[in-house]
Every structure is written in structure tokens, then in C-alpha cells.
Amino acid sequence: MDPGGLKHSKDKGLAFGKLSESSVEGSFSGDTGGSKSTTSTSLMHLPGSRPQPPARDSANGLNVTTTQMELSTGGLTIEEAEVKVMEKAIRMQQPQKPQQNQQLFENFALLEASIADLNRSNTPGSSVLGRPHDLFSLKTENFSPMDKDRLDMGSVSFGQSQKDLDVNERLLGDNTMDILQDLDLPGSLSDLNEFYVSDEAAFLSSLSVEDVLLEDGNMETKPIDCSNGGNCTNVDSADQQKQLLEAGVSMPVIKTEEDADTSFIQLCTPGVIKQENDRRSFCQISSLDLPSTHNSAGSISGPSYPYGANTSTAVSLQQDQKPVFGLYPPLPSVSDSWNRGNGYATGSGMSSSSFPVGFSSPKARPEASGSASSAPAKPSGPTHKICLVCSDEASGCHYGVLTCGSCKVFFKRAVEGWRARQNTDGQHNYLCAGRNDCIIDKIRRKNCPACRFRKCLQAGMNLEARKNKKLIRLKGQQTTMEPNPPPPDERACALIPKSMPQLVPTMLSLLKAIEPEAIYSGYDSTIPDTSTRLMTTLNRLGGQQVVSAVKWAKSLPGFRNLHLDDQMTLLQCSWLFLMSFGLGWRSYQQCNGGMLCFAPDLVINDERMKLPYMTDQCEQMLKISTEFVRLQVSYDEYLCMKVLLLLSTVPKDGLKSQAVFDEIRMTYIKELGKAIVKREENSSQNWQRFYQLTKLLDSMQEMVGGLLQICFYTFVNKSLSVEFPEMLAEIISNQLPKFKDGSVKPLLFHALNHDTMP
């Protein structure tokens, strides 16, 4: 019994506590995440040492008094003090009224004074842990200014009020002793290496807690919410989780453990990350799985374990306590920094091999591994085949091309309807309203049948492919029925018939696809015919045919590769050639060259040819149809010759893209030769046929020249009162000066001048 009437326990020793300036400042500011840089100073009471009053902190409003010395004579034993601590801790969890805060502060200060007085009377040779205090050296750390959000586990923050100022004065009483004031500690984290000693493992192991202590009955106090102006209320797990997520900080868990022989208070602080500059690696000492901020410096407190160690001495969670780390999302920055380092350092300073993935704690390993590992790839289903026409999902190979069912039916109806309308190969009734470049997809494939049919032909669809497929299937069945099958190479050759046509669309098939339909004139045959009315109707029909010819020319393969000025020049010079050649073909097909079939509803017979200004024109046009009858021109030959007429008149100065023009013209000359070979089985007559057809093309220059003179005369002579459509009038106005000054020239096949030969 000391003079103050204070009893000592039989286990006398030293007690450690941590007091942080950041926590003291937090008690006045009420903000744990402030921007001030704080440096924590460890306070230690050693037996036998004299108490030293701490420095007066006038900046924080602290006046050191002798309150704790006066309270040390209360006659309390350490067991009674701990019972009071437990009672106060339990009482702190219950809702308190603002007027009870003063009593709570006084009880807390009374405990501090009792422990301080007990430390003065302890003998130097005993400790709570059963070891002399001189077995390990003192190690302190100066936290870097980056640690702004760390909570100090040895203090409780309260709101800012005048009562708090008085209570905090007693917290730093005269009996509080700071032995670190005598030490001249460095101010940077890198200078602390000299304080680390070789027996650091002994220091860390001395702070370990045995499993027996953890298996006893533990009592916990929940974190206290003191953010409402100094009113401290306990919160349940749901409110605690909400406050933790809103505040973005980690709350400490204060655990009270009691043993039969030894009674002490253990403050388990959360594990944080200690950053070392060696090889950019990181050391993690974990006691509780509480997350820390990205910029927090390392500190060591409580039991220490090597990184990734799954030990049984970790702090056990009670049934009513939820894991604290479950309230926080995993921190990817910790794992990223571990992955960047070459390795890690354990708590004892031993270097271990590096791991590819780092975890904040063993308890969080399943979650971290689940989040770090990439999700298993979903088994990809069967790849969908795309229709080559409309890009829809293909249903199979139809007519030699991978297409959908809609395009299959469309192509079949288009080709069969085309053949049903004409006994021989003819033209379909599809006409593009645009520029023959419409987009054909799943949504817009029904907007333009002409472009859709052209795309089917470009993809290589062919009705003969279905027959060839059946032939291949029959051949395959016959080869399987043979007793001795031939070698694989011979069998593969036998499956392919020799007469199998090409699935790639030919130039002739494209020319058939883009050929314009016949245009009706709308002429009223019930009214008596006059030259003016008849010529006006023919001019109006010619204007419509010119528009159709422009669309047809733009759809020609290779024509749009020419310069735009060259395209306009060729159309202006050859529009009447195209109209006359088409008129001769229709007259040959429908009237066998006896009459002029301008349109299905307008046929010029002998009576109409006798009208004024009609005889000369009709005689020139009948010559063309007569040549068709004499030569029995096929449809394929007609299509190729029509393209060559478009390319038969050019300016004398040449075109801007002359090389491209020459290549295109030579291509269609070869196509004409292919059409001749397709028609004539006798190869000896092919060259003769080619000569006859090219002579017909040259004769078109003379026949159309006479028609142009009549057209120009009718256009200039206003007394005839012949109406010309706007587009046709514009073309004639541009073409007339060129023909008068002779700035254009024809391209002939059989001219005497070899310079004009192709």
C-alpha cells in the first residue's frame, strides 16, 4: 500500500499506450481526414523513471494541470480500474445525452491517472508479458505527411465544445510522462533505419498474443459515433457500415480480454502498409483486415505476421461481430504495387520470393482472387454465317452462293419471271430510282429490287448452280457405289463436272442486270396525228430515255472510274447514238425491222413516216434495224456494242483520264469477242463475225450524224413549235457548238487513218 492508498496487482509491470497528436487535433476539429500533417509520438511509462511533464501546447489550447496527480489517490486497484473501463466502454455504446459527456470524460481521465500512478510504484524487474523491459530496444517511426486519413487507435475523437477543452486538459496532466522528449529523433522516414536493430524479430514476437488468450471470453465495444457535436452514441452494424462508407475512413475495434492470472487491456490497431524504398517493394503487416488509404505510411502495432501467412493467432471474430474488411471494396492499388515490386519483406525483415498477385490479408484472399482473376470466357456458340447479299443470317448455300432464304426466293422469282416474260434472254423490269448504288441490308433490301438483283449477280448467284449441285450429288453417290473406289485425287476430279460454269458473275451478266426497262411514251393514238404533236412526244420520250441512259452509264463497271468531266463529255456526245441503237434493237425484236418501235405504245408505221419532217429521220433509223435483221445480232452482242457506242466519240484534245478510258474500252472489245465466241460454235467464223459487227458500229457514225443535223435544225427553228424537255435542251445546247467547230472525233475500227485505230 503506497501513501496514496493505491493497491498494486501481483503482476506488476509496464503498460504501453499510444497517444497521437492527430487524435488530439481530431478531438477539436472533428475531422479525421484533415489536411494537416501530424506526427505521432509514442508515450511510454517505464517503472522506476521519474515523471516528466509534457510540453505545453498553446497552439491547440491545452493547459497542463495537476488533475491526474489529484485523481491518483482515489484508492483504486488495477482490477477495479479495468472493471470501470469495461463498464464505461459498455456505457459508451448506449445513447448518451449531451449532459452526460462531462462524467464520461472524467471517468476516462480517472483511469489514465490510476494507471500512471501504478507505473510509478512498479518494480523495475517485472512486466505483464513476463519479460524484462531491456530485452528489446525501443523503435519509433515518424509518419510521413501522406498519412491524412489514418485514425489513431488509442484515442477517441469528440466534437468541438468548451467542455472538451477542459477534459483534454486533464488528459495531458502533470503525471503524463513522455520519455521520447529526451530523444532527438529524425524527421524523415528514411532516417529511421538506424533505430532498427538486429533482434527485430524478438521485438515483434514479444508483442504476440497466444492462442490461449484469444480462446477466452472476449468482450467488444462497438465504435462510437461522436460526429454530432460531441454527442457520443453507439451504432449497430448497419449504421456503422453506412457511416463508414460515407466517411470513407476505417473505425477502430477495441477489444477487451481478460485472463485468470493476468488482466490487461489490449488495443488492436488495424494493419496498414509500410512502404520501403528498396527495389520499389512493399511490406504489409496485418493484424486486422482494415483498409488504409493510398498514401498512408507504415506502422507496426499489435501482433505481426508475415505477409500471406495463415496463422491461428489472428484476431478471431465473434459471432455477433461482422468482419470489418467486408465493408470495404478491395483496393486494387495495393495489388498493383505488389505486382510491380520484385518481392516483399516479411515482418522480421527476411526477404521472400515474389508472388504474381498480392492480397491485403489472408481473409480477403478469396475475394481478391475472385476479383483479380479474369472471368471465364463464355463458351461461344456456333458462328453464324452471313448472307453475301443483304448481310442477314444465311440459311445455306443457294444457287452457288451463301445467302439467306429471302434473297434465295427473290433471285429465283426475278430470274424465272424474267425468262417467263421473254422467250430468249432479255431484260428484267427492275429500275433503280437512285444511282444504282443503293445500300442492300436486312432492313433496306426490299427498297430497291434492281440493286438487290445486281448484288445477287455480283455475288455469283446462278440458277445453273442448283443443277450442278444435283449432278455433283449424283456423281458422289455413283462413286460410293463402286466396289473399288479410285484414289482420292481421281475421285475429287470425278466429282467436278467438266461443263460446270463459273460461279463468279461475268461482265455479260452484269450488263444484263443493269439494262433499263422500256419506257412508255403516253401518246394518244385516238387523236389524229400531226408532225408537231408527234415530234413533241418523241422529244419528251427522248428526254426520259436520256435520264435512263445516264443511270445506266453510271452503273457500268469501270465507267465511274473516269473523271467526272469525262463522264459528262461522253454522255453529251453519245446520247443520240444510244437512243438510235436502242430503237433499232426494239424494232428488230418486235417488228422485225419493218416499223420503228419507239415505245410499246408508240410505233411509227408507214403512214406516220409520210408526215412532214418525219420521212428523213425514219429512213435513217430504219437502216439500223435493217442491219440488225441482216446480221441477226444476239442480245449479248447488242449489250457489248451499246457500251462501245458510248465510248466511240471523244474530244479531239483527249480526255482527262485517257489511260483509264482506253483500258475500259479495250475491256468491252474483249467482251464483244466473248459474246461472238458464245454464239458461234465454228471458230473459223469468229473473226468474220467480229469484222461485221465492228463495221456496223462504224456505220453508226454516219447514220447518227444525219439525225443530229435534223435534231439541231428542229431545236433552232422556233417556227416548228417543237417542245424539248429541259434536260435534253441543255444537252443539245452544249453539244451543238462542239459539232459545229469540229472539236469532237469518232473512234472507228476500220478507218484508213491508223492513228484513230484502237
From Swiss-Prot:
Entry's Gene Ontology cellular component terms: basolateral part of cell; centrosome; cytoplasm; mitochondrion; nuclear speck; nucleus; spindle
Region annotation Hinge: where it falls in the sequence: 462-498
Zn finger (NR C4-type) location: 387-407, 432-456
Location of the protein in the cell: Cytoplasm; Nucleus; Mitochondrion; Cytoplasm, Cytoskeleton, Spindle
SUPFAM superfamilies noted in UniProt: Glucocorticoid receptor-like (DNA-binding domain), Nuclear receptor ligand-binding domain
Keyword Nucleotide-binding: no
Post-translational modification: Phosphorylated in the absence of hormone; becomes hyperphosphorylated in the presence of glucocorticoids. May be dephosphorylated by PPP5C, attenuates NR3C1 action.
Pfam families assigned: GCR, Hormone_recep, zf-C4
GO terms assigned for molecular function: core promoter sequence-specific DNA binding; DNA-binding transcription factor activity; ligand-modulated transcription factor activity; nuclear cortisol receptor activity; nuclear glucocorticoid receptor activity; nuclear receptor activity; sequence-specific DNA binding; steroid binding
Location of region: Modulating: 1-386
Region annotation (Disordered) ranges: 1-61, 349-382
Compositional bias ranges of the Low complexity kind: 26-42
GO biological process, one term: response to copper ion
Reported tissue expression: Isoform 1 is expressed in all tissues tested including liver, gills, intestine, skeletal muscle, kidney, heart, spleen, stomach, brain, pituitary, ovary, testis, skin and bladder. Isoform 2 is found only in testis.
SMART domains on file: HOLI, ZnF_C4
Broad class of where this protein is predominantly found: cytoplasm
NR LBD domain location: 499-733
Entry keywords, A to Z: Chromatin regulator, Cytoplasm, Cytoskeleton, DNA-binding, Lipid-binding, Metal-binding, Mitochondrion, Nucleus, Receptor, Steroid-binding, Transcription, Transcription regulation, Zinc, Zinc-finger
Comment, domains: Composed of three domains: a modulating N-terminal domain, a DNA-binding domain and a C-terminal ligand-binding domain. The ligand-binding domain is required for correct chromosome segregation during mitosis although ligand binding is not required.
Family membership noted in the UniProt record: Belongs to the nuclear hormone receptor family. NR3 subfamily.
Function: Receptor for glucocorticoids (GC). Has a dual mode of action: as a transcription factor that binds to glucocorticoid response elements (GRE), both for nuclear and mitochondrial DNA, and as a modulator of other transcription factors. Affects inflammatory responses, cellular proliferation and differentiation in target tissues. Involved in chromatin remodeling. Plays a role in rapid mRNA degradation by binding to the 5' UTR of target mRNAs and interacting with PNRC2 in a ligand-dependent manner which recruits the RNA helicase UPF1 and the mRNA-decapping enzyme DCP1A, leading to RNA decay.
Protein name in the entry: Glucocorticoid receptor
Organism of this sequence: Oncorhynchus mykiss
